[in-house]
C-alpha cells in the first residue's frame, strides 16, 4: 500500500518538488521496466510477452518521489499500485495525483510552459496517462468481487454479466454474478465499495481541479476511467448487499446461503435493474451530467454547453440561496428582500 503523506513530503524546504528527472538514468530505467517484456523470438521459439515486475516498479517509483514530484512518475506508481493492490491501489494512486496537483501545482513536473503564458499542454499530456491503455487494461482486470464458488470476478467479467458492456470472450451470466455477490464476504464487499467511491471522488476532483486552473477548454477528460468506475458502482447497486436485498425475490437470499459453494447458482434470482435513465437521487443527477459531458467532449468538442454543464454540477448540492448567489450575484439582495426576515 502507498504511504501517501510520506510520498507528498517536500523534497526540501528550498525546492519542494525537487529536480526534473525527465532525462535522469533512474527515471529512464523506471520507464523501461514498467513496459515489461514484449513477445520476442529466440531461434525457432517464440517467447510470450511478460508483464512488468510491478513490485520493482513500485519500489523505484516510490524512491524517485524522494527526489522529485513528477506526474509521470506518479502515473507509473499508480499502475503498479493497481496491479498489486487492485481497487485500493487505484484509490490511493488517484489520491496521490489529486494531492500533488492541489499542493504543488506551481512546481510539480512537467512544469507549465513559462515561455508560453504558462501553457499546460505538457502537464495535461502527462495526466492523460490516467486514461491511457496501460492503466485501463489493469483496471479491467481488477477483481470486483471474490466468491468462494467462482473465485475472483474481475471488472470486465462483471460488467459483461450485468449487461453494461459486451465481451464475446466472457461467459459469466447474470445469475452467476448474483450468486458471486451473495457468496462474497460482506466486509470485503464494503471495503470494495469504499474504494470505488474514493476512486470516483478523486477522479472527479482531479478533473475539476485542473479545469479551475487552466479552464475547461484546456482541461483534462478522465471520462473513460470515470465510466468504468461508474459502471462498477452500478454493478454494486444491482448485485451488492443493499441492491440485492431490494431486488431478490422473497426467500432468494436464503436460497443463496444454502447454495454457497454449490454449482447450480441459477436458483439465485438476478436483480432487476432500475428502469434505464431513472434518476432517484443527487448522485444519479451527477452521473447523468457526467454522461452528457462525455458526449460533448467526444462528439461536439467546440460546443460551449460543457461549460454550463460543469457549472450545473457545482449547483446540484447547493441550497437555493447559494444558487441565486452563484448565478445572479447582484440579485441576492433582492432575494433577501423577497424572503423577508428569518423567523426566530
From Swiss-Prot:
Q: Which GO terms describe its cellular component?
A: type VI protein secretion system complex
Free-text disruption phenotype from the record: Deletion abolishes the secretion of Hcp1, Tse3 and VgrG proteins, all markers of T6SS activity.
Q: Which domain of life is it from?
A: Bacteria
Q: Where is the signal peptide?
A: none
| Subunit structure of this chain's protein | Homododecamer. Interacts with TssB1 and TssC1. Interacts with TssK1 and TssF1.
Record function comment: Core component of the H1 type VI (H1-T6SS) secretion system that plays a role in the release of toxins targeting both eukaryotic and prokaryotic species. Forms a dodecameric ring-shaped structure located at one end of the T6SS sheath. May properly attach the pre-assembled sheath onto the baseplate and/or stabilize the sheaths tubular structure.
NCBIfam families (UniProt xref): VI_chp_8
Alphabetical list of PANTHER family matching this protein: CYTOPLASMIC PROTEIN-RELATED, TYPE VI SECRETION SYSTEM COMPONENT TSSA1
- Put simply, this protein is called Type VI secretion system component TssA1
What lineage does UniProt assign to this protein's organism?
A: Bacteria, Pseudomonadati, Pseudomonadota, Gammaproteobacteria, Pseudomonadales
